[in-house]
């Protein structure tokens, strides 16, 4: 038997999000999104955790009140809306065979509440997909990547409300019916588990705007459950409308190491990993796992799934799984009740065996191999690595060039570990 490696047809590409690249926030019939009110933060004020981009109702209203004063970078992105042809040509020049991108919900339904979609927005993505296929590039489309129609956030507090599930279903049906002949691979939500740490970014729900007066813990998991239900409904719609297409999930994969060989640290590691697996188990197995029951009881968190919801979760299982991977973390037991370690740099900075990025995130290529083996062993589904990369402080030389050797070495090291995972027997079909 020959040595396993990247198989023929392996998908090589890159990833973007509509709110990061499109710009044209007030063109083509697009409505305002929550991300259009995220203010510019100077480099010396930025933090490597979610506090930099978490939006509250108070901060949103303050930004709206001073709209003429602040800079809102996501309104302009890199102007992909007007330069998608040049951008996709550059992707082809680099050898891309896949382009992970997202559709802006507010470009299709400007407020989220319209009965009929915005044809100009639909036509824009037709042109983008056609341009991709012109170069033999397969679009891999994220349905919702952190940008919501603003009224959905203000009136419904995002996925706190079940009405948002209904609006999302309408949006999903519209885009899948429109593009099912042009898009083979779909992802429902980007990094759905980040709702545990950056609720508004992931779900459109602001912690200080609960319409039901829920405390933060209850609000978070009510939102999580509504998003998981919406994800299942989206998968079901893809299967009904486009049985030839594949619908996947996308989670920020956490890799945790016990801080010591103390048994309690391993117990904490299991708890931390279970909070990550919770999202995979529901989306890949269609079951609501037992292992958070004690945590919910300790926190007095109620799970409001009906029998119909449980059936929907069973029916809406993903065809493949995907994830982002940026660093590994350390689990250290702090007593009962256990607390989620999270993804903040404080937890990744403590590993003496790893180097750190300029942002204090651990550089751990072997952790990617570990992640791939963990997920394939547990679920047996094909895997697409939706994101990995590194943030660096960079500067141009006198010839206006950036010498990217550090990033080249970073990517090379991670690709080698992907190859090792494939040798291990993991079915990885793209990155």
Predicted feature locations:
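Active-site region of glycoside hydrolase catalytic domains
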Residues: 2-68, 111-113, 122-430
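Internal amphipathic alpha-helical repeat/solenoid segments
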Residues: 77-89, 110, 121
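Active-site mouth loops of central-metabolism enzymes
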Residues: 69-83, 160-163
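A short acidic, glycine/proline-enriched capping/turn motif at secondary-structure boundaries
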Residues: 97, 106-108, 146-148
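Glycine-rich, proline-tolerant flexible connector loops at the mouths of alpha/beta enzymes
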Residues: 103-117
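Catalytic domains of carbohydrate-active enzymes, especially glycoside hydrolases
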Residues: 83-104, 138, 315-321, 378
